């Protein structure tokens, strides 16, 4: 039996790329995908990028699988292929989604963690953060999901700093570059781009508007472009975070192997699933523990046919 590589792309309704579309595109292009003379992942990604120009999610899954297989063929862990030092890896945050304040506090208490990512964008964002801060000394990060206007951001961010918030993610609408330039100059906290930085060409636009970027493998189309985005961000003096879209252990393992090269990570997807489809990474109070297997280090458990539910 040959070497197998595994990849993942979640189906997110908001982006209108359901599982059915990914399967249909795979079936339609199957011969081209399988017959490519694979030598290394970067060349394969460029081929896929042109073969499937309207399906970044599917390209991401195939790209991750290519890197997994490539490292397995070398009998190395993927981070070793890139000469990554995992000793100083960032720890992952744990996300508290928007809910009633009482429920958000309850979720925090249920999951003791060193870093929390707090979703905001409500009429009482400061009330939320105050209540959470009263119940933990952990690091707090705030994700506004493009939910504020400039005046609101200018008003709230100084108060968030007083509450010990570390940084703010995507405070304004993704296309409000004029507002972000003003906020960048005025904000007492670092600002990280999420919706405003999806593709490689977006990175340079973030300079002088954000202090860092949040890369999503699924959105940018895989590990290959993500590595180039990291390099570009470093050259521009931007911080780098990698986020998740509720991937299982398969997609999260891809993020895990990039940890030596980034500053922050949000990869709590497997913690939010009732059922996973693989094993291979563990969480020790935010610290990522790798398996001893090559490639992504995962073992596929064959549960893909079951319904995977996300906890509310």
Question: Can you name each region flagged by the protein language model?
Answer:
Residues 46, 72, 76-90, 286-291:
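N-terminal amphipathic alpha-helix/helix-capping segment at the start of soluble metabolic enzymes
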Residues 80-187:
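Metal-dependent enolase-superfamily TIM-barrel catalytic cores that perform enediolate-based chemistry
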Residues 175-267:
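Catalytic alpha/beta core domains of metabolic enzymes, predominantly
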């Amino acid at each position: 039996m040959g070497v197998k590589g595994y990849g993942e792309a979640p189906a997110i309704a908001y982006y209108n790329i359901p599982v059915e579309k990914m399967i249909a595109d795979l079936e339609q292009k199957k011969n081209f995908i399988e017959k490519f003379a694979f030598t290394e992942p970067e060349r394969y990604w460029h081929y896929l990028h042109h073969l499937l120009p309207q399906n970044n999610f599917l390209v991401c899954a195939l790209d991750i699988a290519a890197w997994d297989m490539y490292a397995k063929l070398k009998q190395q862990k993927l981070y070793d292929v890139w000469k990554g030092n995992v000793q100083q890896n960032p720890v992952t945050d744990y996300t508290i989604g928007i809910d009633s304040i009482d429920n958000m506090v309850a979720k925090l208490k249920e999951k003791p963690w060193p870093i929390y990512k707090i979703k905001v964008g409500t009429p009482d964002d400061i009330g939320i953060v105050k209540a959470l801060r009263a119940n933990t000394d952990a690091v707090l990060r705030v994700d506004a999901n493009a939910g504020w206007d400039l005046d609101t951001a200018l008003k709230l961010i100084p108060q968030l700093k007083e509450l010990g918030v570390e940084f703010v993610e995507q405070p304004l609408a993704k296309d409000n570059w004029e507002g972000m330039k003003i906020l960048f100059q005025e904000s007492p906290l670092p600002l990280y781009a999420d919706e405003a930085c999806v593709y490689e060409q977006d990175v340079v636009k973030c300079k002088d508007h954000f202090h860092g970027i949040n890369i999503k493998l699924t959105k940018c189309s895989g590990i290959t472009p993500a590595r180039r985005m990291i390099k570009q961000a470093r050259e521009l003096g931007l911080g780098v975070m990698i986020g998740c879209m509720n991937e299982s252990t398969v997609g999260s393992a891809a993020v895990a192997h990039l940890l030596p090269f980034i500053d922050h990570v949000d990869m709590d997807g497997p913690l939010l699933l009732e059922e996973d489809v693989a094993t291979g990474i563990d969480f020790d109070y935010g610290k990522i523990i790798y398996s001893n297997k090559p490639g992504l280090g995962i073992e596929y458990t064959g549960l893909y046919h079951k319904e995977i539910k996300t906890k509310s």
